[in-house]
């Protein structure tokens, strides 16, 4: 139980730091505000099997047996921005980021409710680590805190470290004149390679967090309130099992195509690392029985052992996938499950993949079609259909 209490306390402290600085935001009361993601056009080519491996690693799950270390390294090394395979941005879900201003510098950060640190790329990094990133210059506007250093490590093995400065921060019109900012002096190569973002803003809120992500369009994060204009119908709530410190709950069935299994109960963790689309928890990772039944409805689909996941011809029309939440049906459009094309082929990699050990994980493929409420009062989690 200590895990969630520690993180929730850290989030609430950061909320107080922001809300005390600005009592009114866009007509809302203190502590209630919205963030709209910004579109970012990236030339980086992601190799889908590597992204699956990275997701499994983040959640401490073993990779599929056929996905060897050699193939992972080969995939990652050859299919980056300097790779030889040409892929147009439209073949992947467009990338979206969250814009902030630190000092006089505009940066793009990931919003992460799974961590409590606020750190950014800085001019104190080695020059090779700064390449293709927007940089915070603490020497221009910041006040260094003597004898203050930091280090962050994440579940996927990545990390960063550096010094601490006080500086002004602006997030969606929410202004703080003297915020502690962790300026990186070292970051792992994965963050250097991830050119879409320049740091992580880790925080949570006292009451609830809400996310409304979109498919190939900017999503929203509303903090402290529920915007009724963004969903249809009354949200359906499920209790959370927080024993392991996760947003974990039990669903009571699923359906796909002609298959309707309303008695198959399964536990799942709802991905709450708000990084869209290709970092954090992008996939829906469900029990093997569910994924096999879904792909049995997809013509010419096959389990690709070399790449460790289900794939299918890119011109295939995919059926919707539905998760039963009491009387509510959470529909994931088939088009959202067409996650990415394997470079140099006419084969697409699915956003729905199997996971060997419970619980299942519902990441971006699920979230971007849903209106989801993370409510710390309970705790509980709510689901409703997005309003188009």
From Swiss-Prot:
Record EC number: 3.4.23.-
Biological processes annotated in GO: proteolysis
Entry keyword Phosphoprotein: no
GO molecular function: aspartic-type endopeptidase activity
Pfam families assigned: Asp
PANTHER family in the cross-refs: ASPERGILLOPEPSIN-1-RELATED, BETA-SITE APP-CLEAVING ENZYME, ISOFORM A-RELATED
Protein task: Probable aspartic-type endopeptidase which contributes to virulence.
Name of this chain's protein: Probable aspartic-type endopeptidase MCYG_06955
Organism expressing this protein natively: Arthroderma otae (strain ATCC MYA-4605 / CBS 113480)
């Amino acid at each position: 139980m200590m895990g969630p209490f520690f993180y929730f306390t850290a989030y609430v402290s950061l909320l107080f730091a922001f809300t005390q600085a600005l009592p009114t935001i866009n007509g809302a009361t203190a502590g209630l505000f919205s963030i709209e993601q910004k579109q970012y056009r990236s030339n980086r080519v992601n190799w889908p099997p590597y992204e699956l491996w990275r997701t499994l690693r983040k959640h401490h799950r073993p990779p599929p047996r056929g996905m060897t270390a050699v193939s992972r390294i080969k995939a990652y090394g050859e299919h980056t921005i300097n790779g030889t395979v040409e892929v147009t941005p439209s073949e992947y879900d467009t990338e979206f980021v969250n814009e902030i201003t630190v000092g006089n510098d505009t940066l793009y950060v990931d919003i992460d409710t799974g961590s409590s640190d606020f750190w950014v790329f800085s001019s104190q990094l080695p020059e090779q680590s700064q390449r293709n990133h927007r940089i915070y210059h603490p020497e221009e506007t910041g006040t260094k805190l003597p004898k203050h250093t930091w280090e962050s490590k994440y579940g996927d093995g990545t990390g960063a470290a550096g010094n601490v400065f006080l500086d002004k921060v602006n997030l969606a019109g929410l202004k703080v004149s003297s915020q502690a900012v962790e300026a990186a002096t070292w970051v792992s190569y994965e963050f250097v390679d991830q050119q879409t973002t320049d740091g992580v803003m880790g925080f949570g809120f006292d009451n609830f967090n809400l996310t409304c992500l979109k498919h190939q369009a900017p999503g929203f994060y509303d903090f402290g309130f529920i915007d009724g204009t963004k969903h249809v119908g009354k949200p359906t709530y499920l209790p959370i099992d927080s024993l392991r410190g996760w947003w974990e709950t039990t669903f009571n069935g699923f359906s796909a195509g002609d298959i309707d299994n309303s008695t198959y109960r399964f536990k799942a963790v709802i991905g709450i690392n708000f990084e869209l689309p290709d970092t954090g928890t992008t996939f829906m990772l469900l029990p093997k029985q569910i994924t096999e039944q879904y792909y049995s409805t997809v013509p010419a689909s096959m389990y690709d052992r070399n790449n460790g996941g289900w794939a299918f011809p890119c011109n295939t029309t995919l059926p919707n996938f539905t998760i039963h939440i009491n009387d509510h049906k959470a529909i994931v459009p088939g088009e959202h499950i067409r996650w990415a094309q394997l470079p140099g082929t006419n084969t697409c990699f699915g956003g729905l993949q199997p996971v060997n050990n419970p619980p299942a994980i519902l990441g971006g493929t699920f979230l971007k079609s849903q209106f989801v409420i993370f409510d710390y009062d309970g705790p509980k989690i709510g689901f409703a259909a997005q309003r188009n």
